[in-house]
Amino acid sequence: YFVPCRNGWADDYSTHTRGSFSFADAEEGGIINNTYPNTRTDFSQAIASCPVPIISHETGQFQIYPDYAQIDKYTGVLAPWNLEEFRRRLREAGMESQAEDFARASGEWAVRLYRADIEMDLRTRGFGGFQLLDLQDYPGQGSAYVGILDAFMDSKGLITPERWREFCSQTVPLFICDRVCWIADNNIYGDIRIANYSPLDLAGRKVAWRLSRQDKGRTIATGTITIEPQPKKQG
């Protein structure tokens, strides 16, 4: 297998095998940051020329503003001087009272971005998989606060394990469409797919779906589909 963040070089995103980069490494930070939001884009073009499975390297890396309450957890030989310095600068700027808001807002945004990036992997047929930079924060080497968990493997309260597994699990239902925002008179068109990395054959199984309003919980439409057998790869 091959573990890159891109398979070769190009002037566009056609060789990318993850959805985001630094602005120094890709035009405007990559697919997620610089293309119209949708759930159809995948990495099929990037993996087409590779004869072995591709595993996306360090998917994510979405920065989350740190929660300074974790400073008290450092009771061993590692001192959180970086966190203390960040808090000092925020205090000098007169914004220390907003620290929790910054942590919560950036964390909620990071969860959405992780979902977008991971689902891009899952809807790429024939993809070998992905690896995150880390599920937890890494406070060394320049402070990589990119984790859904803090450096002590404790939850930041951003998402429950159950919600995380809705898009990061061995079997994930996916809705494929060209946009993620609609107005009242738009028709919604899309495809339903199942990303299945489990050992189970799901062909013939029934999948129930429901479209509802999140604010009122009112059901708009329901239905069922039958999972079709996947065509076998030739050659």
List the predicted regions and their residue ranges.
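Substrate-binding/catalytic cleft of secreted carbohydrate-active enzymes
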Residues: 1-150
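Generic beta-strand/beta-sheet core signal
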Residues: 57, 133-136, 167, 195, ...
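Outer-membrane beta-barrel proteins
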Residues: 106, 178-180, 197
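Active-site-proximal structural scaffolding
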Residues: 114, 123, 157, 185, ...
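Proline/serine/threonine-rich low-complexity linkers at boundaries of modular beta-sandwich domains
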Residues: 153, 158-173
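Short, solvent-exposed loop/linker segments at the N-terminal edge
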Residues: 180-186
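Beta-strand-rich binding/interaction modules
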Residues: 186-228
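Aromatic sugar-binding surface patches on proteins
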Residues: 232-235
